[in-house]
UniProtKB/Swiss-Prot annotation:
Pfam families: tRNA-synt_His. This is ATP phosphoribosyltransferase regulatory subunit. Heteromultimer composed of HisG and HisZ subunits. NCBIfam families: hisZ_biosyn_reg, PRK12292.1-1, PRK12421.1.
């Protein structure tokens, strides 16, 4: 790196300047207030942890996204967090160790080795909420509602909500007797909706024809909520786990349609995001014109097992930077203020303190500084009036 480009940041790493930084902070405060009103307690996990704790129960994807380094104190491998969800699960299972439903929220920068998608960020500001200790539709619906309220607070509309359920695939794969390698291959094909490949793969399995047909049907079971009725027909005879999963999706979809009729629902039974750690309903939110998911979430009941407690859990996460960018709200103009001259008069200092206590933005001049009040971003000044009192006047 030469002297002329020392200012360059690594690809995918951003800094927030005025007024964007102000908008991000405003949105952050609004979201934390929202979560507080819903009963979610704020936690602040560390930026770095030992790798075995940081990657617990998350699969290989998060491992690849995690920057790793060696602890100079003991030689153990550490990771810079790429996702705060496992950290919050550790806090619930080990640090808090409560027996009642626990609602936690979090917000902070995470770091990725590679961006998600073209020109994506490697340093998102992750925002999320998790509900531990309840296994049922009420907590699933609450999580989705809070995610949708998050969008509302940040001014993001025109939401598409995609619903799925990993237990349907797990049950059908178990019926077919798939090995771990077979399951991984089929999983990849389903994500690509590669129906000819799926059919050829299934035809090579030593499984009953009706079992293979049900797995093949997964690749086509996507669309509006009518897909759930079609799934009941095509997956008939698949077993109680599949029926229960379809019932759960129907109940969740009904609740969302009733409470948020403006949200457009899409059901995709082959969408298996987070398959390696999710255990039930999964969901993602999209907006037109944005190729990546805006938020994701779902049920993951086993993630706390290695920390000593496998509590039921569901939650969601999103990126604050993306929310602000998609909000459609113009960035506020630079805040204006009151300029106070560089004068040691105690009465001036008292006037400045009084104005600041009322929430005014007051910039105190510095002896010998260049630039006038307007150059300092001020539209008013503190000046002596005819009675030698310090008063605020417009420029």
């Amino acid at each position: 790196m030469t002297d002329s480009n020392r200012w360059l940041l690594p690809e995918g790493i951003e800094e927030a300047l005025p007024p964007l930084a102000e908008r991000l902070e405003t949105c952050r405060r609004q979201l934390l207030d929202l979560y507080h009103r819903w009963g979610y307690e704020l936690v602040m996990p560390p930026m770095i942890e030992y790798l075995e704790s940081l990657l617990t129960g998350t699969g290989s994807d998060l491992d690849l996204q995690t920057f790793k380094l060696t602890d100079q104190l003991n030689g153990r491998l550490m990771g810079v967090r790429a996702d705060m969800t496992p950290q919050v699960a550790r806090i619930d299972a080990h640090s808090l160790n409560r027996d009642v439903p626990t609602r936690l929220c979090y917000m902070g920068t995470v770091l990725h080795t590679r961006p998600d998608g073209f020109a994506g960020s490697r340093s998102p500001m992750q925002v999320g909420a998790e509900l531990y200790g309840h296994k049922g539709l009420d907590s699933d619906v609450e999580t989705i509602r809070l995610m949708l309220e998050t969008f509302r607070v940040c001014g993001v509309g025109n939401i598409f909500l995609d619903l799925g359920h990993v237990d349907i695939y797990r049950s059908l794969a178990a019926d077919a007797g798939l090995t771990a390698d077979d399951e991984a291959q089929l999983f990849d094909m389903l994500q690509r909706k590669a129906l000819p490949e799926i059919r050829a793969f299934l035809n090579g399995l030593d499984a009953p024809a009706e079992v293979r047909e049900r797995l093949l049907a997964l690749g086509e079971l996507n669309g509006d909520t009518a897909v759930l009725d079609e799934a009941r027909r095509l997956l008939a005879g698949a077993g109680e786990r599949v029926v229960r999963a379809l019932d759960e999706l129907s109940a969740i979809a009904g609740a969302v349609q009733r409470l948020y009729p403006e949200v457009r629902l899409h059901v995709d039974l082959s969408e298996l995001r987070g398959f390696h750690y999710h255990t039930g309903a999964v969901f993602a939110a999209y907006v037109p014109g944005h190729g990546q998911e805006l938020a994701r979430g779902g049920r993951y009941d086993d993630i706390g097992r290695v920390f000593g407690r496998a509590r039921p859990a569901t939650g969601f996460s999103t990126d604050l930077k993306t929310l602000v960018r998609l909000s459609g709200q113009p960035l506020a103009a630079a805040p204006r203020g009151i300029f106070a001259p560089a004068d040691p008069d105690p009465a001036l200092l008292d006037a400045v303190a009084e104005l600041r206590s009322r929430g005014e933005r007051v910039i105190q001049g510095l002896a010998g500084q260049g630039g006038d009040a307007a150059a300092m971003g001020c539209d008013r000044v503190l000046a002596r009036d005819s009675k030698h009192q310090w008063t605020v006047t417009d420029l």
